[in-house]
């Protein structure tokens, strides 16, 4: 949070940029670790931190795609066990991250169908 505040006040400051660069490997590792452990909410927090540190980093697009795919996978699993509410949330998260993620349209159709049947 302190770094985010410093970036907002002095984004071109050399020390602020150095601090962001030092933190970046830990933030990337955080995202990978949380995705591997299937903790997608925590993974999203790591992704958000990465985006704050390096908003133009080329790796963000792939990270967004991976996170969207994980939301789809977990949402689909939970939908299969009857948790429509979580599936709706997972769909929103995936759409917000990567509207072109493979499998998103099919997942959206399954969620809509289940949601309509839930009413």
Q: How would you label these PLM feature ranges?
A:
Residues 11, 55-58, 99:
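Short coil turns that delineate tetratricopeptide repeat
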Residues 6, 50, 93-94:
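Canonical positions in the second alpha-helix
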Residues 24-30, 64, 71, 105:
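TPR repeat positional signature
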């Amino acid at each position: 949070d302190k770094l985010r505040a410093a970036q907002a006040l002095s984004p071109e400051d050399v020390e602020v940029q150095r601090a962001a660069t030092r933190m970046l490997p830990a933030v990337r590792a955080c995202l990978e670790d949380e995705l591997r452990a299937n903790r997608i909410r925590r993974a999203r927090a790591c992704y958000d931190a990465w985006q704050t540190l390096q908003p133009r980093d080329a790796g963000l697009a792939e990270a967004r795609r991976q996170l969207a795919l994980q939301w789809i996978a977990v949402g689909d699993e939970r939908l299969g066990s009857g948790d429509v509410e979580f599936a709706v949330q997972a769909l929103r998260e995936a759409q917000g991250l990567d509207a072109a993620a493979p499998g998103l349209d099919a997942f959206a159709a399954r969620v809509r169908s289940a949601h309509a049947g839930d009413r």
